[in-house]
Amino acid sequence: MQQINMADSTRNETAVEEEMRPRAANEALRKLWTTQTLGIAIGCLLLMNFFMNLTVYTQNVYEPYATSHFDGHSLLTTGSIIAGIVRIVSYPLLAKLANHFGRPQGFAGAAVSMAIGNAMYASCRNVDTFLAGTIFDAFGDSWWNIVQQIFVADITSLVNRGILFTLPESLSAIPTLYGGTYLGEHILTTSSWRWGYGMWAIVLPVTAIPTIGIMIWMNRRAKHVGLSNEKVSFMHGASSGPIGKVKHIATQLDLIGALLLIGGLAMTLLPMTIAGRNNTDRWSRPSSIVLIIIGVLTFVAFLVWDGKFASNPIIPYRTIRERNVIIACASVITIAMSDSIYRPFLSSFLQVAGHYSPGAATRVDNAQRVAYNIGALVCGVTLKFVKNTKPTIMLGVVLIILASGLPIYLTNISGTHIASEPAFITSKSLLGVGRGFAQVSLQVSLQAVMEYEQVAIATAVYLSSVGLGSNLGVTISGAIWNSLLPRKLVAFFGEEDGRKIFGSIVVAREYEVGSAERNAIDECYRQTQQTLAIGSVCVSGVLLVLVYLVRNVKLDAEDEKRAAQADEELAWAIKQKEAKEDAPIELEEGRR
C-alpha cells in the first residue's frame, strides 16, 4: 500500500513538474547555438547556395543544346512551365514535411532530389526522362529553399534574421550570375552538356553534407541537455494493417488537402502560364477556360476541407487569418505581379526600339538581380539597428513605386526615342533595391507574429505568393503585348509583313536604323512597352494601401520576450536532465 502511494506521489510530482514547464523548447534550442557554431552553419549554407546558383546559371547555357538534341521538342517548354508550377505549389507540403521529419532530413531529401534531377538530365535518352528530371530538380530546389528559410528562423533572433536570411543567397548569387556563364561555356568546349548536368549530381549532395552534419551535431547537443524535440513517433496512433497505416499517414500529412491545393493551383496556373507571353490565342479555347474554372472550384474545395474537415490542415486558418500574414502575402503578390507585367518583353524591346545589343539588354536585366541581393542584405543590416519592420517596408514600397513609374518616361521619351542604357540600369537597380527592402522586411514581420510551430507554413504560403504574383503578371503582360503590338504593326505594314515583324525580333532588327520602316517599328514597340509600364505602376500603387495596413513589429521587444521564455525552458530542461542522470551539465561558452 505504501509502495502504491509512493508511486502515485512520484507520478503527481512529475505531472506538476510538467505543468510548470515553460513550453518554449524551440526558443531554448536557439540558446545552444554559439557564435562559432552559427558562423559554421551560415558558412555551410553559403557553400551550398553558391553551388546551387552555379548549377542554375550553367544549366541556362546547356539548355539550348539539350533542346537541340531533342529537335526542339515542344514538350520541353511545357516541362519548364510545369517545373515553375511545382515550385509554387510544393512549398506548403514541404513545410509540413519539415515540421514532421526535421531539418536535416529535409536538407538531405532536397539534395538527393536535385541530384536525381541532374542525373536524369545527363542520362536521358528521350524527352520524357528530361521532363521528369526537370520536375525532380525543381522540387529539390524548392525543398532546400523552404527548409533553409525555416532553419534560419530556428537559429536566429528576429533582429538578426533579416541579415541571415539574405547572406547565403546574396553573397553567392552575384559571382555565380556571371561565373556560371563562363563555366558553362568552358564545359561545353571541353566536354558535353551531358557531363555539364551530370557533374552536379555528384557536387550537390557532397556540398550539402556540411550543412546536414552541423545540424545533426547540434541536435545531439540538444539531447545532451534535455532539450530534444520530444516528438511522438510519426506512426503513433496508427491502426494495425497497411490500410490503417495509409489512412494515418494521409491524416497526419493532410494528403487530401495537399492534393486539392496542388490540383487547384496547377489547373489554375497551367493555362495562364501556357497562354502567358506568346500564346494568348489559347484564351479563345474552351479547354483553357474550363481548366481555370475547375482549378478555382478545386481550390475552394481545399479551403472547405482544411477549414471544416481536416484534423491536421496543411494550412491552418489561424495562420492565414493573422493580419501581417495576409498583408505580407498580398504585398508580395502585388510586387511580383507589377514587376512581371513590365519585365517579360523588356529585352526584346531594348534590342528593337533601343537598338541595344543582346549583351546590353542582358546587363539591364541583370542589374535588377544584383541590386535585389544587395538591397536585401542592406535591409537585413538596417533591421538590426532600426529594430522596427514598418520603416524598411515603407522605404521599399516607395522605391518600388518610383522605379515602376520611371519607365513610363524612359520607354518613350517625347514620343521619339528611349533612354540610354545607364538610365535603364538605374531604374532597374532602384526596383531591385526596393524589392529587397520590402520583401525581406515583410518576411520578418510575418514570422515575428507567428508561434514557432506555424512559422514554417506561414513562410511557405509567403514564398508561394511570390510565384503566384509572377504568373499573374506574365499572363497580363502577354495579353497586352500580343494584343497591342501586332495590331499596331499591321496598321503600318499590312497583315502579312506586320505578322512577320511581330513574330521575330530578328526580322524587326533587319530594317535599317533611321529608315521610315524602322522608325515605325520602333514607335510601335515604344508605345506598347509604355502601356506595360503604365499597367505596372498602376498595380504597384496598391502597395500604398497595404503598407498602411501592415502592423509594425518591434523586433527587440519581441526578442526579449522570447529570450526570457527560452532561458526558463533551458533552465527547466537542464534541471530535469541533471535530476535523471545525477550529474551536472555544463554548457558551452559563447551561447547567444
Residue ranges, per PLM feature:
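Small-residue-rich alpha-helical segments with characteristic i,i+4
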Residues: 162, 176-188, 424-502
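Helix-to-loop junctions at the C-terminal end of transmembrane segments
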Residues: 89-103, 188, 375-391
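Cytosolic juxtamembrane N-terminal segment immediately preceding the first transmembrane helix
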Residues: 1-59, 68
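Transmembrane core module of solute transporters
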Residues: 44-47, 54, 59-62, 71, ...
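Transmembrane-helix exit segments and adjacent C-terminal regions of multi-pass membrane proteins
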Residues: 2-11, 508-592
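Helix-loop-helix hairpins in multi-pass membrane proteins, especially solute transporters
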Residues: 93, 97-256
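Interfacial helix-cap and linker-helix signal at transmembrane-aqueous boundaries
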Residues: 66-67, 97-98, 121, 130, ...
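Hydrophobic transmembrane-helix bundles of small-molecule transporters
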Residues: 194-327
